[in-house]
Amino acid sequence: MASYYEILDVPRSASADDIKKAYRRKALQWHPDKNPDNKEFAEKKFKEVAEAYEVLSDKHKREIYDRYGREGLTGTGTGPSRAEAGSGGPGFTFTFRSPEEVFREFFGSGDPFAELFDDLGPFSELQNRGSRHSGPFFTFSSSFPGHSDFSSSSFSFSPGAGAFRSVSTSTTFVQGRRITTRRIMENGQERVEVEEDGQLKSVTINGVPDDLALGLELSRREQQPSVTSRSGGTQVQQTPASCPLDSDLSEDEDLQLAMAYSLSEMEAAGKKPAGGREAQHRRQGRPKAQHQDPGLGGTQEGARGEATKRSPSPEEKASRCLIL
């Protein structure tokens, strides 16, 4: 294990303020919620940082550490006497607190990750996007040349009576692919969702892949757009598409009425519809039959005659169809 000064990246002559600034920077850097993809290593570093700060921030403990090292505090080696170590019974050893307790004591009830924006320069305005107990955190890495890697994380803390909830979302762009990891810690349970280019790829609960949770989440996401599509499709189907068919039917009815009218006119004039051999003879003898329409009083000649200039009426067309 490296020395406490190396862990906090400060010289041995660092002042108390230097120790505090170093702990703030390192604790936020290695907080497990900030490193969901490298949890075990982050937890180890987070614990070392808390231990180093707990010793170097205390003047008496720092003196013991400078003289005897870490063994002088744990009692595993040649260390100070009971009087030097402070009050305690025989065999006194220093007991380190949990890193989470040190973290909460240092930052209090405020937003711990908001502290980073003091040193982010032009990005400090992004702090306003978070609420009192939440705030975004951004990190940038090399993007030159041909390699694009950007990650962002947002944290939400809900401290309460023994309850702690943390939501972390990180997005990384690597070689044109977008990898998004969402990690939720609540009531001692960890849920991690991993997306690639917007497609959910995996869901793990407490480090164990959960296919059932993955299927339920995929189904929930697919239901939302399908409901919208179905509601929109109903309106499209209401567009009337039968108008051309209705128009054709109306034209057929008009033609039938015209034909019936012509037949009645011919019967009233004492003529019979052409048919049988007489009709065949007339069709073979001349291209077009000549007939007189008593209703209109006009004549029509065949192809050899001289055609009239006016256009035939619907009744005349119907009569011509019957004759032919």
Curated annotation (Swiss-Prot):
Annotated Gene Ontology MF terms?
A: ATPase activator activity; Hsp70 protein binding; polyubiquitin modification-dependent protein binding; proteasome binding; protein serine/threonine kinase binding; protein transporter activity; protein-folding chaperone binding; ubiquitin binding
Which segments show compositional bias classed as Polar residues? Answer: 224-241
Show the ranges annotated as biased composition (Basic residues): 280-289
What results from changing residue 321 to S?
Answer: Loss of localization to the endoplasmic reticulum and relocalization to cytoplasm and nucleus
Task: Give GO cellular component annotations, separated by semicolons.
Answer: cytoplasm; cytoplasmic side of endoplasmic reticulum membrane; cytosol; endoplasmic reticulum membrane; inclusion body; nuclear membrane; nucleus; perinuclear region of cytoplasm
Upon changing residue 31 to Q, the result is:
Probable loss of interaction with HSP70 and loss of the ability to reduce PRKN aggregation
All copies of domain J, residue ranges: 2-71
**Annotated tissue distribution:** More abundantly expressed in neocortex, cerebellum, spinal cord and retina where it is expressed by neuronal cells (at protein level). Detected at much lower level in non-neuronal tissues including kidney, lung, heart, skeletal muscle, spleen and testis (at protein level). Isoform 1 is more abundant in neocortex and cerebellum compared to isoform 2 (at protein level).
Q: Does the keyword field hold Chaperone?
A: yes
What residue ranges constitute the propeptide? 322-324
Q: What pathology does the entry list?
A: Neuronopathy, distal hereditary motor, autosomal recessive 5: A form of distal hereditary motor neuronopathy, a heterogeneous group of neuromuscular disorders caused by selective degeneration of motor neurons in the anterior horn of the spinal cord, without sensory deficit in the posterior horn. The overall clinical picture consists of a classical distal muscular atrophy syndrome in the legs without clinical sensory loss. The disease starts with weakness and wasting of distal muscles of the anterior tibial and peroneal compartments of the legs.
Looking up PANTHER family in the UniProt record yields: DNAJ HOMOLOG SUBFAMILY B MEMBER 2
One Pfam family for this entry, by name? Answer: DnaJ
Name-wise, this protein is DnaJ homolog subfamily B member 2
One GO biological process term is: regulation of chaperone-mediated protein folding
Q: Which InterPro entries match?
A: DnaJ_domain, DnaJ_domain_CS, DNJB2/6-like, J_dom_sf, UIM_dom
What sequence ranges are listed for the domain UIM? Answer: 210-226, 250-269
Q: What does this protein do?
A: Functions as a co-chaperone, regulating the substrate binding and activating the ATPase activity of chaperones of the HSP70/heat shock protein 70 family. In parallel, also contributes to the ubiquitin-dependent proteasomal degradation of misfolded proteins. Thereby, may regulate the aggregation and promote the functional recovery of misfolded proteins like HTT, MC4R, PRKN, RHO and SOD1 and be crucial for many biological processes. Isoform 1 which is localized to the endoplasmic reticulum membranes may specifically function in ER-associated protein degradation of misfolded proteins.
Q: How is it modified after translation?
A: Ubiquitinated by STUB1; does not lead to proteasomal degradation.
Is Phosphoprotein found in the keyword set?
A: yes
Query: What gene name does this entry carry?
Result: DNAJB2
Residues covered by region (Disordered): 70-90, 218-324
Consequence the record notes for mutating residue 265 to A? Loss of interaction with polyubiquitin chains, loss of interaction with PSMA3, and loss of the ability to protect ATXN3 from proteasomal degradation
The superkingdom listed in its UniProt entry is Eukaryota
